Amino acid sequence: MASEAERTFHRFAVFGESSSSSKEITNKNFSKLCKDCDIMDGKAVTSTDVDIVFSKVKAKNARTINFQQFQEAMKELGQKRFKGKNPDEALQGVFKLMEGKDPATTGVTKSTTVGGVDRLTDTSKYTGTHKERFDESGKGKGIEGREETTDNSGYVSGYKGAGTYDKKNQ
């Protein structure tokens, strides 16, 4: 039972934390775990209770708790959630609520294309000078597409038409 709870603990410890090694959980993820696993019901256990218990079990100047401290916190929350049961039964009840749960991502916004966005981003529909900025595949040409570069090679610095003299005088 504790191993399943430990797996759930690690899944929530890593959630949203790029630098987390999943050995310790932050207060934010601890609250999310309690909310997503229905330990926090809003009546017997509130978000305030969860924050107080987290602060009680963590070290004085620490910001995270490890799995050992997490079990102590769950024991305290279990006694509040399951009144009338002894601490071990309450802990087992909390672990049963945690079984197989993952961090929920409800309400997370996804990118959508609204209205004329596809018209503006489709390079095949470009006209005029903007059309010349992209090749057939839609990839940008870079500086060649933005600026007209002239060929400055010639006999002297002021001569701009290399190879045109012979064509004129024939």
Swiss-Prot record:
It comes from Mus musculus (Mouse). The lineage of its organism: Eukaryota, Metazoa, Chordata, Craniata, Vertebrata. One of its GO terms (molecular function) is tubulin binding. The keyword ATP-binding does not apply. Disruption phenotype: Male subfertility with a significantly decreased sperm count and motility. Sperm shows increased irregular mitochondria lacking lamellar cristae, abnormal expression of electron transfer chain molecules, lower ATP levels, decreased mitochondrial membrane potential and increased apoptotic index. Residues 105-170 are annotated as: Disordered. Residues 105-117 have a biased composition (Low complexity). It is found in: Cytoplasm, Cytosol; Cell projection, Cilium, Flagellum. This is Tubulin polymerization-promoting protein family member 2. Residues 129-149 have a biased composition (Basic and acidic residues). Probable regulator of microtubule dynamics required for sperm motility. In contrast to other members of the family, has no microtubule bundling activity. GO terms for cellular component: cytosol; sperm flagellum. Belongs to the TPPP family. Keywords: Cell projection, Cilium, Cytoplasm, Differentiation, Flagellum, Spermatogenesis. The keyword Metal-binding does not apply. GO terms for biological process: cell differentiation; microtubule polymerization; regulation of flagellated sperm motility; spermatogenesis. Only expressed in male reproductive organs, including testis. Expressed in elongating spermatids at stages IV-VIII of the seminiferous epithelial cycle in testis and in mature sperm in the epididymis. It comes from the Eukaryota. InterPro entries: EF-hand-dom_pair, TPP/p25.
